[in-house]
């Protein structure tokens, strides 16, 4: 990066070998603003003044903590300048003010904002055995073995993480939310498999993350996902055929089912039976609604309380 190239020779050696002096100065400009290292932390200062927000320096964007002034690196949850905010005439760059909300941004090890737009796979260092879990704060796994894995993220035009549902290239994706129970986490990961959102189950392709619709055979069971992606439950009419999907799990049922105080029979394909049908050598009759006829006569034939035709 440009500012590293401008470090004075002594400061460069000290920086890379970790032998930090009390104060190391580099990247000076004509107005006296400069990068300064103090006790292993980097600041942008002019005398006793510290930058404490966004700053564009030599065409690169940095963020300095709004309280301490320390240059940030890695994932940061920080405010983004509002539309129409003031851009002041600062030396060697601009300072942006007016912050309506915070978003997640990614800065490299030199503190430079990574101006990603669209999909980006980032290598993430984590401290748990399978990679950072959704909803896990970084400090939650400080004592665990460090692992690395790649995670797919989507960045908007402001270079911040998108979260929630994303429609891209005619497909829907779901990006993990960063706020859970009022607390902010590092989210934004492209989800895969089953997800539960707003009291509804959805299924995302395990490889691409694309939201699935229609009939899906998963874990040796059939499910139906509506055009919205929502998992169907209960009775479902597909064309002219009725199916029953478990009210809780959504898996397609076959054979005998008891719903609303009524018996129904579903073929091995899941389709609901109507009319006369035979099961294990016994004849039964189901009305056009699929309800099993019991203890009555159908076309002069008697069916008992179990629905079986009695000769």
For each feature predicted by the language model, list its residue ranges.
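Extracellular adhesion/carbohydrate-binding repeat motifs centered on closely spaced tryptophans
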Residues: 2-311
């Amino acid at each position: 990066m440009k500012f590293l190239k401008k470090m004075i020779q002594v400061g460069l050696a000290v920086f890379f070998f970790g032998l930090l002096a009390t104060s190391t100065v580099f990247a000076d400009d004509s107005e006296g603003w400069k990068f300064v290292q103090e006790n292993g932390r980097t600041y942008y200062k002019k005398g006793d003044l510290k930058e404490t927000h966004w700053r564009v320096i030599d065409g690169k964007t940095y963020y300095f903590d709004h309280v301490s002034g320390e240059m940030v690196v890695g994932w940061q949850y920080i405010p983004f300048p509002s539309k129409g905010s003031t851009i002041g005439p600062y030396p060697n760059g601009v300072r942006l003010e007016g912050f309506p909300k915070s978003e997640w941004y990614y800065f490299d090890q030199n503190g430079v904002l990574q101006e990603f737009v669209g999909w980006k796979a980032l290598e993430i260092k984590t401290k748990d055995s399978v990679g950072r879990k959704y909803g896990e704060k970084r400090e939650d796994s400080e004592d665990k073995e460090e692992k690395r894995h790649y995670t797919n993220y989507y960045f908007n035009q402001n270079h911040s993480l998108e979260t929630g549902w994303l429609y891209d290239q005619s497909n829907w994706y779901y990006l993990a939310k960063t706020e859970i129970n009022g607390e902010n986490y590092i989210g934004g990961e492209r989800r895969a498999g089953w997800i539960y959102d707003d009291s509804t189950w959805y299924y995302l392709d395990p490889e691409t993350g694309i939201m699935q619709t229609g009939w899906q055979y998963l874990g040796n069971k059939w499910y139906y996902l509506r055009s919205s992606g929502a998992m169907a439950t209960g009775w479902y009419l597909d064309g002219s055929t009725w199916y029953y999907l478990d009210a809780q799990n959504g898996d397609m049922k076959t054979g005998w089912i008891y719903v609303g105080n009524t018996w129904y029979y579903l073929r091995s394909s899941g389709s609901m039976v109507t009319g006369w049908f035979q099961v294990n050598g016994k004849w039964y009759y189901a009305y056009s609604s699929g309800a099993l006829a019991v203890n009555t006569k159908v076309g002069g034939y008697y069916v008992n309380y179990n629905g079986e035709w009695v000769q």
